[in-house]
Amino acid sequence: IPSVQASGNIRQILMDLSKRYQDIIIDAGGQDSEALRSAMTVSTHMLLPFRPKRRDLKTLVHVEKLIRLAKAVNPELYTRAVITQCPTLPSQVQRILDAKEACESFDLIPLNNFTCNRNIYDDADENGLSVFEMSSDEKAKQEIEQIAKEFLGDL
């Protein structure tokens, strides 16, 4: 898979890449940046991950403003939230539901599917691999497949 590293205003880079590739995936990191903002102006889809923790959910106010600004330039931008690193204990389900509700309160629709807190995600990241390349952890693979299918549909 070809990859490009870029920072700053990446709008023109993305527009050039879109002439050569059908699909472009952008990982703009977990903070507000010029790269994130410029990517939002030309992207078709944007998936925003949030852990079901106060520290992440407190950023929803800022994220809502960013989305509003981006949609002023790119009204077709399809945005969704995904809850990640969720606890696996059944007693913690309310934490996931509360995180989804928090997203909805800022007009950010959460996906039904989510990822659980699994070591395989960290292990794969450290090795520069995906969970599909890394292991036989079928639950992690299934989580990612379900998120992709729900978010991208039949693209």
Where do the language-model regions lie?
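P-loop/Walker-type NTP enzyme "switch/lid" segment
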Residues: 1-26, 30, 34, 73, ...
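Inter-motif core of Ras-like GTPase G domains
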Residues: 16, 33-54
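Structural beta-sheet core signal
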Residues: 26, 48, 81-83
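Conserved C-terminal guanine-recognition region of P-loop GTPase G domains, centered on the G4
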Residues: 58-76, 84, 88
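Charged helix-capping and loop-helix junction motifs
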Residues: 65, 94-100
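Beta-strand-loop-alpha "switch" segments that mediate conformational coupling across diverse proteins
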Residues: 87, 99-129
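Inter-lobe coupling/hinge region of RecA-like P-loop helicase motors
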Residues: 121-148
